[in-house]
Structure formats: structure tokens, C-alpha cells
């Protein structure tokens, strides 16, 4: 498929962008998910396979955050990486995915909040998220200046990711957020990881971030991370379109 955006018909949207953070919205959205086509934010597995597979090992214990009804976990299994645990805080979609992939016993599905993972420290070799952090940040009014609440929410998730990773474990984030928006979140020394960035997609670029626990951030990356609550402002344009809080933030990436 073309790596342009969601792969299925757009479901009913929340009244406001901040609704993407509410479990009630996702529970309602995923009613009937067991029988519906997978919905893929930022492209399906084939779009970023060449970037992802070199970072995986056949015996890796892999955790997928905010799985939704994406086929990603199953595609990873088919790629030769069988040990995949997927979590979402919508119990509705977790039940649907358990039913859909009941024939694959090494795929596990758990209802869980990504800000408070119920796994022991050092449980996974790889943690992967695709669009989950984007959804948590959709309520932000200004992408250049994330609120202290937004920074705290992302920090909660990333602290948990670092905790459940083994030494030398990898965290992989797939997102629409370019480095000038996302690096400052990932480039924090207390997570104890390094940071690399790549892009993928045809026409519209998406972003692939790789963090490896036990390696260090560069001086330049640490400097960007230090700006987390006071990032540089973008140039003021001579004219602009007024954003609406009713705009479908996630679907707006489609071409």
C-alpha cells in the first residue's frame, strides 16, 4: 500500500482532538473491531519493514504499545519474530484482537495504560509504538510549545518504556512528528538511551526513531532535550490558517 495514512475508512471522529486521549472514545470506536479491517496509522508493516527488521532478533521479547486493531503485531509474527505482547487501554479492542488472533498462541493481548505498565523491569528486548504518543498529544494547542501536562504524560510513558527494557534493549517510535517536535522528548538523559532518526513513506514522510538503552545521547541532542519546556519558537508567518479544535488532527496527514 502507499504509505500515506490510515488504511481503512475513517471512523467517527471525537468531538474535540483531546478526545483521542479518552478511553471512552476508543471503546466506542472499536465496537465490532473483531470483524473490521485493520486500521493503520502512518503506514502498514511493508512501509517501514526495511527500517524495523534489522533492529529485531528472532528471540526478542517485543512489546507493542497502543496496538489498537492494527495488524502490526501479527505482521511482526509473520516476519519471524514470534514473541509479541500487545497492550491497549481499550478493553474492547483487546478482546477483539484476542479473538481475531486466537490461532497464534505466542501473540498476547493485555488491557493496560502505557503510563503504568504492569510488567516487571527488564521484561522486553524491544518496545514499539506507532502513533500512540501522537494520540496522547493531540489535545495540545501549539505543537511548538507542549504544555507541562503534555510533557509529563510523555515522560510517564518513556520512563515506563525505559524501565521494562533490558540493558541494550531498543525502543522504536513511528510517528508523524518531525525531529524539531519529538527529539526534545526523547533526548532526556534519565532514560539512559541513545537516539537515531530516519524517515519513510512515499510523498508524505513519516518518522522512525530508534533509542538503544545503555548508549548515550550526543551533546547536541542533550541540548535539544534541555529545551523541553522552553523550545524555540517557529518563524511567524505573514499569513496562516486558523486551526480549529474540531480539526481531525491525526487524519489530516493523509494526502
Curated annotation (Swiss-Prot):
It is an enzyme of class 2 (transferase). The keyword Hydrolase does not apply. The keyword Transferase applies. S-adenosyl-L-methionine binds at residues 26, 30, 41, 66, 88-89, 113-114, 130. A motif (Required for methyltransferase activity) lies at residues 129-134. It catalyses: L-lysyl-[protein] + S-adenosyl-L-methionine = N(6)-methyl-L-lysyl-[protein] + S-adenosyl-L-homocysteine + H(+); N(6)-methyl-L-lysyl-[protein] + S-adenosyl-L-methionine = N(6),N(6)-dimethyl-L-lysyl-[protein] + S-adenosyl-L-homocysteine + H(+); N(6),N(6)-dimethyl-L-lysyl-[protein] + S-adenosyl-L-methionine = N(6),N(6),N(6)-trimethyl-L-lysyl-[protein] + S-adenosyl-L-homocysteine + H(+). Keywords: Methyltransferase, Phosphoprotein, S-adenosyl-L-methionine, Transferase. One of its GO terms (molecular function) is protein-lysine N-methyltransferase activity. One of its GO terms (biological process) is methylation. InterPro entries: Lys/N-term_MeTrsfase_sf, Methyltransf_11, SAM-dependent_MTases_sf. Its EC number is 2.1.1.-. The modification Phosphotyrosine is found at residue 39. Belongs to the methyltransferase superfamily. Protein-lysine methyltransferase that efficiently catalyzes three successive methylations on 'Lys-36' in eukaryotic translation elongation factor 1 alpha (EEF1A1 or EEF1A2). This is EEF1A lysine methyltransferase 4. It comes from Bos taurus (Bovine).
